[in-house]
């Protein structure tokens, strides 16, 4: 019987890959303008070359405009918006006042003179009265009794206690006080220490919610009459940081979240005048980097709950003095020891003056992103008038000369119940950049985002087709090399099987 032959040869599988349409077909179906005239079915003509020039020129202009827009975006420009908003109620600002004389002469004791007499420029290094020929007789008598140190045993001296005890008392300075027509008291002023010593803040917000104004104009804010007590001023026989050539008070109007920085930001008010301060609240909003340079992170200070330039400066000055003098001044926060009078004179005052005037790099305080400040307009009238001086002298049991030299009135009020907003805004964002680029794409080459997707889709199909064809050819060649003789007869199979029986 003739055996049959079974052909067991394995043929490679032929995979059919979809070939992408020709470039001419894609060009005539694409939404990209102009390429249908470039990739045409006809031979290359002058018309085709012109379309190539037009298309490449448009593409060049498009790239130029896109680069310009991207560069403008990377400059992170901003615009400033100014607006005025009316409101029925406004929080009244904090008002800090400081007498320009920080130490009352009558409150100085023998122990004070022993420790701080040289700092106050009253005594020399030998504990003797300086410039005795300039001293008035009444002052000299007081100094003689207090500078007899022959049997004196000095006691402990603390600068904070000294400033607190000898500073002007608001109960003695405040002759009258009204807020929105209602009387206010010395207890409505909280004590705060500054470089001027013991100062006072009205409406600080520390003991309760801050007071508000419901109407603008004079008589709807704070009106105080003060006695600056010039007879308590330290006699000046030389220049020192603790003595003042001026008479009056320093005033700062600020928000409740901002500590007073009155030696740098305050304005002066002189005796013998009524000073009207018309305020308008300004709310400033700045942008952080890269559009601006404001500080948007929480404060790193251990002493202040909110970041402000005043808080940053105070914190920085404190660190500077602790590092250079190993102590702090009375108005500075923290737990470092207070400077002694010797350190005040030899280290603290010179170091702080140097920091304020020259070393601006050490205290680099960024602008906060949100600021509340108050613009001010000041006007003055003479007080007292000839008609009122006798009445005031009788009312307060003072001489007419004393009233003229010491009494002043400060009137702080809102101009109107509105506030001004000054806000920085991003001038060019991602949406604007995409809109400009999309508009230019439509103008120059008639393209959109979907057109770009069409191009990528066609390129993807072409790349996939070429890669798959290349892979299939390699696979076909490998199969031909390894399976060149895979054909067996049925007799060979039977012979192979019989060996196992």
Curated annotation (Swiss-Prot):
Stretches in topological domain Cytoplasmic: 1-54, 461-501
Domain comment in the entry: The second transmembrane domain (TM2) is a discontinuous alpha-helix disrupted by the GAS motif, which forms the selectivity filter by adopting an extended, belt-like conformation aligned approximately parallel to the membrane plane. This peptide belt encircles the waist of the channel and divides TM2 into two discontinuous helical segments. The distal helical segment of TM2 interacts with the cytoplasmic portion of the first transmembrane domain (TM1) from a neighboring subunit, contributing to the structural and functional integrity of the channel.
Site keyed Involved in channel desensitization: positions: 84
Locus of motif GAS motif: 446-448
Chain ranges passing through the membrane: 55-71, 430-460
Keyword list, A-Z: Cell membrane, Cell projection, Disulfide bond, Glycoprotein, Ion channel, Ion transport, Membrane, Postsynaptic cell membrane, Sodium, Sodium channel, Sodium transport, Synapse, Transmembrane, Transmembrane helix, Transport
Tissues and organs where the protein is expressed, per its UniProt entry: Expressed in central nervous system. Faintly expressed in the trunk, presumably in dorsal root ganglia.
Catalytic activity field: Na(+)(in) = Na(+)(out); K(+)(in) = K(+)(out); Li(+)(in) = Li(+)(out); Ca(2+)(in) = Ca(2+)(out)
Locations listed in the record: Cell membrane; Postsynaptic cell membrane; Cell projection, Dendrite
Entry keyword Transport: yes
Organism: Danio rerio
Family: Belongs to the amiloride-sensitive sodium channel (TC 1.A.6) family. ASIC1 subfamily.
Pfam family, one: ASC
Classification via PROSITE patterns: ASC
Covalent S-S links between cysteines: 98-199, 177-184, 294-369, 312-365, 316-363, 325-347, 327-339
One record GO biological process: sodium ion transmembrane transport
Subunit annotation: Homotrimer. Heterotrimer; with other ASIC proteins producing channel with different properties. Interacts with asic1c.
Function: Forms voltage-independent, pH-gated trimeric sodium channels that act as postsynaptic excitatory receptors in the nervous system, playing a crucial role in regulating synaptic plasticity, learning, and memory. Upon extracellular pH drop this channel elicits transient, fast activating, and completely desensitizing inward currents. Displays high selectivity for sodium ions but can also permit the permeation of other cations.
Positions of glycan attachment: 164, 370
Gene: asic1a
Name the record gives this protein: Acid-sensing ion channel 1A
Highest taxon in the source lineage: Eukaryota
């Amino acid at each position: 019987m003739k055996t049959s032959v079974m052909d067991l040869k394995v043929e490679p599988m032929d995979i059919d890959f979809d070939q992408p349409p020709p470039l001419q077909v894609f060009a005539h179906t694409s939404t990209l303008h102009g390429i249908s005239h470039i990739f045409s079915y006809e031979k290359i003509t002058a018309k085709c070359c012109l379309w190539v020039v037009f298309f490449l020129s448009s593409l060049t202009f498009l790239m130029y405009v896109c680069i310009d827009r991207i560069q403008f975006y990377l400059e992170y420009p901003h615009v400033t918006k100014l607006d005025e908003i009316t409101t029925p109620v406004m929080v009244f600002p904090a008002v800090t006042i400081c007498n320009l004389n920080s130490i009352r002469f009558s409150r100085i004791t023998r122990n004070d003179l022993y420790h701080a007499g040289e700092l106050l420029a009253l005594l020399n290094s030998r504990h003797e009265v300086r410039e005795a020929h300039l001293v008035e007789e009444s002052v000299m008598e007081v100094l003689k009794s207090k500078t007899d140190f022959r049997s004196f045993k000095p006691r402990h001296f603390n600068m904070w206690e000294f400033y607190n005890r000898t500073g002007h008392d608001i109960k003695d300075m405040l002759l009258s006080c009204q807020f929105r027509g209602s009387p206010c008291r010395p207890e409505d002023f909280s004590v705060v220490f500054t470089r001027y010593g013991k100062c006072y803040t009205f409406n600080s917000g520390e003991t309760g919610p801050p007071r508000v104004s419901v109407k603008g104009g004079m008589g709807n804010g704070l009106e105080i009459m003060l006695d600056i007590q010039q007879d308590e001023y330290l006699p000046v026989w030389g220049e020192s940081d603790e003595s003042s050539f001026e008479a009056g008070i320093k005033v700062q109007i600020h928000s409740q979240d901002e500590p007073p920085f009155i030696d740098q930001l305050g304005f002066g008010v002189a005796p013998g005048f009524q000073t009207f301060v018309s305020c308008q609240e300004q709310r400033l909003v700045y942008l952080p980097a890269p559009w601006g340079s404001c500080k948007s992170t929480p404060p790193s200070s251990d002493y202040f709950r909110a970041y402000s330039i005043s808080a940053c400066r105070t914190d920085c000055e404190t660190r500077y003095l602790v590092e250079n003098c190993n102590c702090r001044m009375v108005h500075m926060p923290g737990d470092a020891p207070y400077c002694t009078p010797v350190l005040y004179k030899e280290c603290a005052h010179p170091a702080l003056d140097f920091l304020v005037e020259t070393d601006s790099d050490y205290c680099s305080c960024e602008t906060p992103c949100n600021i509340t400040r108050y613009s001010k307009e000041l006007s003055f009238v003479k007080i007292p008038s000839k008609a009122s001086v006798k009445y005031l002298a009788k009312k307060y049991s003072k001489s007419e000369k004393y009233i003229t030299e010491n009494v002043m009135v400060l009137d702080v009020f809102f101009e109107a119940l509105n506030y001004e907003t000054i806000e920085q805004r991003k001038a060019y964002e991602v949406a604007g950049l995409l809109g400009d680029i999309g508009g230019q794409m439509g103008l120059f080459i008639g393209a959109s985002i979907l057109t770009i997707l069409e191009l990528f889709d066609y390129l993807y199909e072409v790349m996939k087709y070429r890669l798959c064809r290349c892979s299939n050819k390699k696979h076909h060649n490998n199969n031909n090399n390894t399976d060149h003789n895979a054909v067996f007869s049925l007799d060979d199979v039977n012979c192979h099987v019989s060996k196992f029986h």
